[in-house]
Structures are given as structure tokens and as C-alpha cells.
Amino acid sequence: MEVLYSLSKTLKDARDKIVEGTLYSNVSDLIQQFNQMIVTMNGNDFQTGGIGNLPIRNWTFDFGLLGTTLLNLDANYVENARTTIEYFIDFIDNVCIDEMSRESQRNGVAPQSEALRKLAGIKFKRINFNNSSEYIENWNLQNRRQRTGFVFHKPNIFPYSASFTLNRSQPMHDNLMGTMWLNAGSEIQVAGFDYSCAINAPANIQQFEHIVQLRRALTTATITLLPDAERFSFPRVINSADGATTWLFNPVILRPNNVEVEFLLNGQIINTYQARFGTIIARNFDTIRLSFQLMRPPNMTPAVNALFPQAQPFQHHATVGLTLRIESAVCESVLADANETLLANVTAVRQEYAIPVGPVFPPGMNWTELITNYSPSREDNLQRVFTVASIRSMLIK
């Protein structure tokens, strides 16, 4: 993997900097590095493809070295270099595609394609010019079963979940009380509602709670907490739990009371915030517990009082909500990130070449299913294919 990264970094620099008119002295170190790459690769044969619709291609390396010049690089020099650069880039692209198409239930973090396994050989170690990539560093640590640390912005840590629970229900569905939520990606939105606006609740207060367990622990997370859940702020028709009928949800938004968010790790509370909104920090957690209250307003204008009558029918439904959004966090496991294209790149390659469903990844790389059942085997394979995708993205946009 380190060799693949070094080849890609060298080729990217060569493509960007070996251009007509450049002073040789400005790129002499790069050209020496480029020549070292050629010397190491010459005389070797590789094969890629042969899975799904990915065609088999054979690669042979027999290239001349780039020479020295006293002045600027001329058109002939650059054209000669370009021929070599384009062949190498095509090779790296195909190695990456081949690697992203394969998976293994055992030691999935190790190279799976024939070409990348060959590049891992001792003869290619001299190509290791630059291993500064975060993904390469973490791949090395994971390969040695040591602790990794990926920094994510908008991590896709929450599997998609949209549902409701009813604490008070009846066949007519005209006086309900409960909680509904939408968890997805890096965001939780939860709303508590009471058609009667807590008129019969103790002290006219209804208590709500929403608990979310993460598939992997996060550390040093920057989080935004808001006293609102905009996705539950408009009327909707909802299917009943048994699917036999539908019921109306017509919210009128109130501000939640006594809001508390707890971040827990292995059942132990690590951080607690009460009535604090905006930016908050969570040190280390694998579970989030949100609790909040709906309080019937003790004083109401006639217009508000008309919204929340003392008895049925309840045409408007008192609702309070919260939004919790993870803005950035560190995770020991690799995750999809809304700010990166790695999952999209891997999925697109596997779809384009009709890669058959293997023993590890779900059909279509379904992220909700993948993260819901995030096994060590999936983690290993995902770290490998994401590392390869990050390498490929240097050369192929």
C-alpha cells in the first residue's frame, strides 16, 4: 500500500511539474525520484482485472530514464516524460480499481489483488518516497493491529432510522402522545408530542427520552445541539404501527424544557450538558441519551389557548424537539464521511464493473446495512478499499 501511495504521489508531482519551459534545476530532485521509480519497475510484469466486468490487462515495464539538461525542459523532453507518466497512471488506476473490487473475510486489511500483492514485495520497498497520508498511516497501524485514529467531518455514524413510539394510543388515533425520530449520517432529530398538550400529565409536564447507540466509539467530538427538530415541524400523515390505518400529525412547536444530553461510554456517563445549546464537546462516547420535556404553557393568550383546548377534539398537536449534529470527531474505525467521496468512489467502481456480491460487503455497498452490522471483517476491508480510493483520488478525479 505504501508503494502504491508513493507511486501515485510521484506521478502526480511529475504530471504537475514536468512541463515545457520549467527550469531543470527546479525539478531535478523530482526527476531523480522519477528515474528511481522507473529503474525499480523496469523488468516487471503485472496483471489486473478478471473480476466482474473488469477486463484482464497485462502490464510490462521497460522505459528509458529521463535525462539531464542545463536549461529549461523542452517539448521533446516533456513529450517523452508524458508517455511514461500516462502509462504509469493508467497502471495505478487499474490496480486501484482491481483492489477496490475485491474483499476477503480473513485479513481484509491486506492487499487482495495480484498486482498490489506483488507491489508489496521487498524489491519495491525503495519506491517508498512519501507516506504522509493519514489513510496510509492508519492502514499501517491497522495492519499491525494497533490503535488508529481517523478525523472525520460529518461522519456517517448513525444508520438510517425513522420511526415513532406511542406512550398513549387508542384505536381512533385522535389523542396520541409519544416520540418520533430520524437518525441518519451525523444527525439526530427527535420530537416529543402530546395531542392534549400535557393537560392530564403530572404538573402539566410530559417527559421524553431518546437513546442512540453508536456502532463505534467517537472521541473529541464537536457537536451542535439545537432546541428544535425542523423535520417534524410540519403536518404529515403517518402509517400506524400495525399498518392498518394512518393518523394525522399536525404539530405546533413549543420550546423544550429541562433539556439534558448525556454522552456515555460502556454505560458510564462521560459528559453531561443541561439546557446548553449551540456548540458542545463530547470527550469519548458510544451512546447518546437525550431527555427533554413538554410543558403546557401556564399562561396563554386567547389565540394560543384556542390551539390547546381543555378537551377533544385536539386539532393541533403540541410538539417539542431537538437536533443533535456531529460536526467533527475522531474514530478508531474508518467511516464514510459526508465531506469525502471515498464511499461514492468505491461504490461507483463496483457498480460500473458489475462486481458480484462477495462475503463481506452488502449489495450495492448499502451504508445503512454496512454500519448497522459493522463487523471486524467489514472494518478491515473498508479501511483497505478507502485507503486505495484515497490514493486513486490523487490521480483520477
UniProtKB/Swiss-Prot annotation:
Binding partners and assembly: Homotrimer. Interacts with the inner capsid protein VP2. Interacts with the outer capsid glycoprotein VP7. Interacts with the outer capsid protein VP5*.
Species annotation: Rotavirus A (isolate RVA/Human/India/116E/1986/G9P8[11])
Alphabetized GO MF terms: host cell surface receptor binding; metal ion binding; structural molecule activity
Similarity annotation: Belongs to the rotavirus VP6 family.
Location of region: Interaction with the inner capsid protein VP2: 62-73
Keyword set, alphabetical order: Calcium, Capsid protein, Intermediate capsid protein, Metal-binding, Ubl conjugation, Virion, Zinc
Keyword Calcium: yes
Main location: virion
Superkingdom: Viruses
Note: The VP6 trimer contains a zinc ion located at the center of the molecule. The zinc ion is not essential for either trimerization or transcription activity of the DLP. Zinc-depleted VP6 has an increased sensitivity to proteases.
PTM text: The N-terminus is blocked. Sumoylated with SUMO1 and SUMO2. Sumoylation of viral proteins seems to have a positive role on viral replication.
Coiled-coil positions: none
Annotated Gene3D superfamilies: 2.60.120.170, Viral capsid alpha domain (1.10.1350.10)
An example Gene Ontology CC term for this record: viral intermediate capsid
Name this protein carries in UniProt: Intermediate capsid protein VP6
